[in-house]
């Protein structure tokens, strides 16, 4: 896909995120919106996957370590064709298969159930290690939050991944610098994130995580890196695309009301129209 096609797709995914969270009357729009461009590139350009065969043996694997941004993952999976987009409005509803955190047993395209922060990287490292052991060509991707990496288990997993030279592993950190109760650097600063991963023998790439030129270049560089895992530190805007949500930590975990929903969708419709003029 061209960058313009990716931008248009990401905008549609953002619409779905806002719609799903509004319908649920709860959820996590901020981090879902900041990650939308990463999700889009992974599922529409980077990963070897087949929505018609979600359990394809040689598929690339994805672990959503920051499981609370499930609206972002679900919206991407629906846009990619894993299940009907119409199902997104059942998010968090009683009886729906689309609950607040990813469920690998019931949702097509989900490789790992997640939700308890800090655990996803360990799972991704295990998947990557098995791939190496079995001499498989698949790659493993995981998305972590910058607040999430305050968890110690993240760094145990990183240490082992670097030690084992898992060059089939790519860790993306959604660095929007906001978490549920404030800025990441004020709550418990993990900075400098890049130097920490480098200390554990990762190849590190710093990018603007809302810029497809930089996203594309980063994943290409990761594929070309041999003998060590890659960490992509993606600087993003929390609530990206919705004017009143951008860079506001209050939107970490709450749903827009009806009036706010209309404003958010108008923002995204306007963005879509602008993309059509390019």
Pin down the residues of each PLM region:
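Glycine-rich beta-alpha junction loops
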Residues: 68-69, 73, 176-177, 211, ...
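Thiamine diphosphate
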Residues: 109, 113-116, 121-224
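Short acidic, glycine/serine/threonine-rich loops at helix termini
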Residues: 74-75, 103, 153-155, 181-185, ...
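Cofactor-binding active-site loop characterized by glycine-rich and histidine/acidic residues
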Residues: 17-21, 32-163
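Glycine/aspartate-rich loop-and-adjacent alpha/beta segment that forms the canonical ThDP
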Residues: 212-278
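N-terminal capping segment at the start of a domain
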Residues: 10-26, 174-176
